[in-house]
Amino acid sequence: MLMLIPFSLIAATFRTLKSPSQGRITVFIPKYLQRRHCLKASRAKGLLLISQQEKYKSSQNIKSKILSSVAFCALPLALLCSSSLVLADQKPKTNEGFYNPLAITKPDPLLPNSVQPLTPAQQLKLKAALDKLNQQAAARLAAGDSVGAYGIWNRELRLRRALGFQEEVEALGRVGAIAWSDNQRSQVQVITQRLLEIQQQILSKQSSLSLLNSLGFAFQQVREPRRAIATYEQILARTRLAKDVAATQATLRTLAELNLSWFDYTKAAANYQELLNYATQAGDRQSSLTYLQQLDYIYEKSKQYQQAVAVKQKLLGIYQNDPQLSLDLPSLRLAIGKNYQALNQLQAAFQNYQQAYNSAWTLQQYALAGDALRQLISLYRAQGQIDEALQTSQILVEAQQRASNIYGMMTAYDLIGQLYLNRANYSEALGAFQKGLELAQQLRYQETYFAQQIQQVNQRLSQ
């Protein structure tokens, strides 16, 4: 037996649900609720058919159940509608849809309600209050309350807008740096978005260089190198136009460091080359040295060995005329030799290795002399000049001995042993490996290796 319930009864129930702000709300019964109560709509008759298997036996019970269910479904919607204005203030979203605490616009007791710009006295008062907020936030973070800390900082950042872009940008950069080091990615994201908004607003204006510099630095603090570089390039164009040499050089230094730190060697080299030109024209010897060293580093890292040699030759001239820098001549000669070897200019490489060895030995830099000797031995072996390699290896042993480098002596004897093996001079090879074993036993390192070498040589001698 089926019981018929007028659909108008349920429709009337729907009409009783209202939102305080939106008026009437139409609420639909979800499918899972229809299945639960075995409800089926009949469009033709306008009736709902309810099976006898329902727990409720009377129309009154069914009405009560429907009212409860509909109210249960509609209540969250009603609450959502009635609080929509509050939520709009409390949880603003960015274009990407994430929560942006910097977009909250509700009034703040620290900010006067007047629409007029703040007077100088009001600005000083607000700035002092915001500095206190910054201190409170830092204390919260130190105490482990990161949520409370960033809540206070976000309030500070919102209020900083009343003090102008300069104050706001500096504060954004400061908090952004803290958030980045604290791994607060969402906080960094909203701060970066605000910096981009400010950048867009000042593009059409002839903003001060001070503001642009602050903006560029803030982009650095939130790890946005491309934005920072673009900002500094804008500054550079203006300083060049104004023929402000000091400001141009300062901006070039910033750009050079930025490009270098983000591994853009091409742009960094161009920046340092321009700085070198300025320093050379001004006769600034110390700055010239600094920029040449930076260029040398860049060319080494980018494996531009021809440019590296050219820069090192300029450094060589400076080192030779400065007694304090002359101690670095052996290492510079050694580096030049390696560059020439990488360029397959072996004769030039050999000459620089020889000069590196001679100057290092004269300055009693025996470890460095040993490095130069190893490079010479490598060249001799590559050219098949085994006798020269052996003679140089004997000097290498002495250099390592003077440097008190037991490990270096051990590897030198190993090298000598290998050279004698190449010439099938097994008795000399055996002597070299035995000396190497003695040193290995002192170090307790590679003892097995030398023992195996000795065993193999003895086997060949016994054949």
Model region roles, listed by residue range:
Residues 2-36, 43, 51, 71, ...:
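N-terminal leader/linker segments that initiate helical-solenoid repeat arrays
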Residues 122-124, 143, 161-165, 182, ...:
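Short coil/turn linkers that connect adjacent helices within long alpha-helical scaffolds
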